[in-house]
Each structure stands twice: as C-alpha cells, then as structure tokens.
UniProtKB/Swiss-Prot annotation:
UniProt subcellular location: Cytoplasm
Domain of life: Bacteria
Active site location: D12, D131
MF terms (GO), sorted A to Z: imidazoleglycerol-phosphate synthase activity; lyase activity
Catalytic activity from the UniProt record: 5-[(5-phospho-1-deoxy-D-ribulos-1-ylimino)methylamino]-1-(5-phospho-beta-D-ribosyl)imidazole-4-carboxamide + L-glutamine = D-erythro-1-(imidazol-4-yl)glycerol 3-phosphate + 5-amino-1-(5-phospho-beta-D-ribosyl)imidazole-4-carboxamide + L-glutamate + H(+)
Encoding gene, per UniProt annotation: hisF
Gene Ontology cellular component annotations, sorted alphabetically: cytoplasm
A Pfam family this chain is assigned to: His_biosynth
Annotated protein name in UniProt: Imidazole glycerol phosphate synthase subunit HisF
Record-annotated disulphide pairs: none
Signal peptide: none
Function summary: IGPS catalyzes the conversion of PRFAR and glutamine to IGP, AICAR and glutamate. The HisF subunit catalyzes the cyclization activity that produces IGP and AICAR from PRFAR using the ammonia provided by the HisH subunit.
Length: 256
C-alpha cells in the first residue's frame, strides 16, 4: 500500500505571532499560532510545522511556552525548528510537545550535531531543514543550488543537494527543502530543486516554498515530494487543506 502524501501547514513564528513575507522579507502578521494550529488540525492537516524564524538570527532557543501551547491544541505530529544548537535543545523541544525537531544553521557549522541527535533520539525525530536557493552570480556548485542560513540572508557556498545527501547519511530521517527564491511568492515550488534532492536521498522529502495553486502541490508531488508544505495560501484563505488533498487525489496520489 503506498504511503499517503502529507499536506503540512507551516507556522512561521516571530515574537509570538505567525508571520509571512516574500523571500523571508517584509514579514506581515498572519495570526495567533495556537489558533491557526487548532484550525489546521480540524481542517485535516496531516502534520503541522512550527518554525521560530528569528531564533537563529537572534542567537536564542525556540520559545518553549509557545510550542507547548500549540502542541496541546493539535492531535497530529508537530515538527518544530529554529535555534536548535545542541542535543539539549532537542530534549527541551520534545518535552514541550514536539514530535520531530528541525535543525538548520547549527548543523551547517557543525555537521556532527546531526549524528549526535540521531544517536540520542533516533532518526525519526531528526529533520534536516534546508533553505536553498539557485546559485547567484559568483557562486558555483555542482547542482546549481546553494545552502543559505539566517533566513536566506547568508550564502554558504555549500551545494544544497550534496548537503542533503550528507545529512541523511549522518542520520537525518527527513529533509525539509525550502526554496528561498520561491518562498512566499505563490509562483510555484522549485520543481527542479525537488527533483535534484529526490535523486540523492531515500528519506521522506518535504517540499516548501512557492505554493500558490492546487496544481503547484501536484507538481511538487510529481517531482518526488513525500509531503507538501505551505503557509500563506492557508493563512490567508487562498486554498484549504481539503482542496489541496482533493487535487492530489484526483492526480492519482494517495492522501489521508
């Protein structure tokens, strides 16, 4: 029996509020994270992702109280990311109610962190979060995609596809692939990026960045995504989770 494709709303949280911008800039308020999580759970979300978007740039841990309040309201798995720099941070988030923990910036600086987390908690808990972009002028990688940090503001010169492969070999049980170029644009997922990462990882792949129409979700699934993540189209009522699932089902994909 095929594994059902997951539809995942994303809560980008800053200062206790859900925010959304374009290419991680010009953030505007989108609501209360606890209320939105409750709504998406009721609307049929398969999982919910909670990203503290300013934790890494501000050098602090994710706000545990907000994670706990959100986890108490939902009955689907909750992935939490932002500001995870040590095994102890993972422990704190799991105790607060997270089911999976996303690691991004800290793992780039010290890839061994992925191995340590996987050894402590198992790879099913560990999500590698990759904010990737097409290489700008002056940057060359084999795949044409570069890993960025700090909300897409800082290039690393690291090949995004090679990094995804290394991270899964170190124990990441899932890859959350976010296109910085497409993020918030509603112009469609970066299908080529999804295909490139799909070719090198066997773990579940979550596609993020750019969803605008139900056809975009179908395109991401056809490119090899096991889950499709979106924020603004759900926050602002452009699409419902049910509409996305209906389109995926009509395209021949198994959904819950």
């Amino acid at each position: 029996m095929p594994v059902a494709l997951r539809v995942v709303p994303c809560l980008d949280v800053d200062g206790g509020r859900v925010v959304k911008g374009v290419n991680f800039l010009d953030l505007r308020d989108a609501g209360d994270p606890v209320e939105l999580a409750r709504r998406y759970d009721a609307d049929g979300a398969d999982e919910i992702t909670f990203l503290d978007v300013s934790a890494s740039t501000q050098g602090r841990a994710t706000t545990l109280e907000m994670v706990s309040a959100t986890a108490e309201q939902v009955f689907v798995p909750l992935t939490v990311g932002g500001g995870v720099r040590a095994v102890a941070d993972v422990e704190a988030l799991l105790r607060a109610g997270a089911d999976k923990v996303g690691v991004n910036t800290a793992a780039i600086a010290r890839p061994e962190l992925l191995t340590e987390i996987a050894q402590h908690y198992g790879n099913q808990v560990l999500v590698l979060s990759v904010d990737a972009r097409r290489c700008p002028d002056g940057v060359v990688t084999d795949s044409g995609f570069e890993v960025t940090t700090h909300g897409g503001r800082t290039g690393t010169g690291i090949d995004a596809v090679e990094w995804a492969a290394e991270a899964t070999s170190r124990g990441a049980g899932e890859v959350l692939l976010n296109s910085i170029d497409a993020d918030g644009t509603t112009a469609g997922f970066d299908v080529e990026m999804i295909e490139a990462v799909r070719a090198v990882v066997d773990t579940p792949l979550v596609a993020s960045g750019g969803a605008g129409t139900v056809e975009d979700f179908v395109a991401a699934a056809r490119a090899g995504a096991d889950a499709v993540l979106a924020a603004s189209v759900f926050h602002y009522g452009t699409l419902t989770i049910s509409e996305v699932k209906a389109a995926l089902r009509d395209a021949g994909f198994e959904v819950r």
